[in-house]
Amino acid sequence: MKVALFTETYLPYINGVVTHVKILKEGLEKLGHDVLIVTADTNAKRHYVRDGILHCPATSFKRFYDYGLATPVSSTRLKLVKRFNPDIIHIHNEFGVGFSGAMIAKILKVPLVYTLHTMYDDYLYYVAPRPFIPIVKKTSRKYARFLANKANALTGPSKKVEEYFHSCGVYKDVNVIPNPVELDIFLPHNIDEEKKNAFRGKYGISENTMLVCFCGRLGREKSVDVLFKYWAKRVKPADDMKLLIIGGGPSEEELKKLAVELGIQDMVIFTGKVDHKELPPYYASCDLYITASLSDTNSISMLEAMATGLPVLHRYDPLNEGQVKNGINGYIYHDDAEMYNYLVMMKNQTPEEKERFRQSVRDSVNQAGCENLANYLITVYTKAYEKALEKKEKETV
């Protein structure tokens, strides 16, 4: 099967969508399928294809992590995609490249699959001042409905996506397909032991200190401020716990100031932006992963930490239930008291209990590799392709 994957962001950018698309491409190719990535590129002066990637000229969007935005209409893009002759077009974003994917699918009469990765209601402050957010929210939902109605199949990494589509007035079936993780990179036995040991030394963290990490873009939607407030309310220096914040973003300086205001600056370490390939020893040096975010659908950073064996402490989110199971791969907390109780409980586990828990966590994600993701989606693609073929045959009768 020939599959064109349309995504506004791709390598060298790193985010959940990029990782998902990269792993999907690898999985599809391992199974013998042909893949074309269509993406925005702020360095491209013209459309060109290289190494299976169609680069589309784009403008940098400063307010949204400097990602590129391509124009939605391009006859050159249409010509190059037509030359690839896809059986399926699969869009992963809703902006210029995603919209053009939907339009090209219609022009070429190719089935369209649409994956919603992002809860845009949580990101509107990037594009609109507060007084305009209700209007932008309404417009954003209308646009999501428009794209969903164009698609032959919808997918998303959690039930949260289904609920979002319902709120937009879309009641089609949503194929819930959990996000993937690059298992080979994050499995503990593949992580450089020297780098792992050097990490704690670099930050002056003793072996006895419980190191709790969060990894992600530091934007308001990640609720790191909530995590800091919970931490400040309960955790004391005598508890011998430190919070490692891995990543950078627009809220980084604001969060550093908040840590000082809350008096927890000596318990919080900011690493700044870290290259994705350098992440494994960071996770491997930690004892557990924590998040207060309610905007994620199925956090890839969390899954990567789990592949390393880190139990997850996740703030309660009814639409993401089942991703973290108490005592299996982590614990769900509802408030600061519950968060603290779990921290203390896990700090007091014996080495044997910790290792058993880590193995249980790793087991919970061992089916999240590239080929499993590709197989899930090939099933979706095949159904969409067969239905489209059936419809075409009826129209010609």
Where are these regions (language model features)?
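Aromatic "clamp/platform" in nucleotide-sugar-dependent glycosyltransferases that forms part
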Residues: 294
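Conserved donor-binding/catalytic core segment of Leloir-type glycosyltransferases
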Residues: 206-231
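Conserved acidic donor-binding segment of nucleotide-sugar-dependent glycosyltransferases
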Residues: 326-327, 331-337, 345-351
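Nucleotide-activated donor-binding/catalytic signature segment of Leloir-type glycosyltransferases, i.e.
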Residues: 253-274
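Short alpha-helical donor nucleotide-sugar binding micro-motif in glycosyltransferases
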Residues: 148, 273-274, 281-286
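N-terminal subdomain of nucleotide-sugar transferases
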Residues: 1-45, 49-55, 382, 389, ...
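Carbohydrate-associated surface elements
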Residues: 41, 160, 180
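Short hydrophobic beta-strand element within catalytic cores of glycosyltransferases
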Residues: 311-314
